[in-house]
């Protein structure tokens, strides 16, 4: 072998030796033992109280009956403008992406004629035996997909309690015979 080949092989072996030495040294310096259980533990404070389901417990902070006692249907009409891209509210109004909401309070859920409801909404309605009472409207309008899993409604919800109460008061007014307001001292109905 000539000296140029010996120099090349020596340089290659020297480089491999240096890299291996650095690797072994850094493994010794920066060694991290394997965890007993893979993953990270995230410690977070529990939010809101009580029942599983969170959204229902949070919405129950102030019962809708108490909020409706001071709700303003005129303010609710302004909130309803968010809904008009998908819903109508006049008597005999057409269905859009969502059903017409005239006389919706106390109407059986998923029962409006001429509208094709999602499977999630039909399941939730239990064959139209569940009604849009004030509590169901309150929980649904807070977070539609959380209250009715599988609903096709793409609206994120109305987070502020007072805005929801105003909107429900306005929806109540969309009727020839508005449903009576609930007793503000009554306990909220349990959600299924």
Curated annotation (Swiss-Prot):
Stretches of the chain found on the membrane's Cytoplasmic side: 1-7
Membrane topology qualifier: Single-pass type II membrane protein
Keyword terms of this UniProt record: Cell membrane, Electron transport, Heme, Iron, Membrane, Metal-binding, Signal-anchor, Transmembrane, Transmembrane helix, Transport
Chain ranges passing through the membrane: 8-25
UniProt-listed Pfam families: Cytochrom_C (PF00034)
InterPro entries associated with the record: Cyt_c-like_dom (IPR009056), Cyt_c-like_dom_sf (IPR036909), Cyt_c_1A/1B (IPR002327)
GO CC field: plasma membrane
GO MF annotation, one: heme binding
Stretches of the chain found on the membrane's Periplasmic side: 26-192
SUPFAM superfamilies for this protein: Cytochrome c
Location in or out of the cell: Cell membrane
Binding site for heme c: 83, 86-87, 153
Modification note: Binds 1 heme c group covalently per subunit.
Family under the similarity heading: Belongs to the cytochrome c family.
Function: May be involved in electron transfer from bc1 complex to aa3.
Name this polypeptide is given: Cytochrome c homolog
Organism this protein belongs to: Agrobacterium fabrum (strain C58 / ATCC 33970)
Lineage: Bacteria, Pseudomonadati, Pseudomonadota, Alphaproteobacteria, Hyphomicrobiales
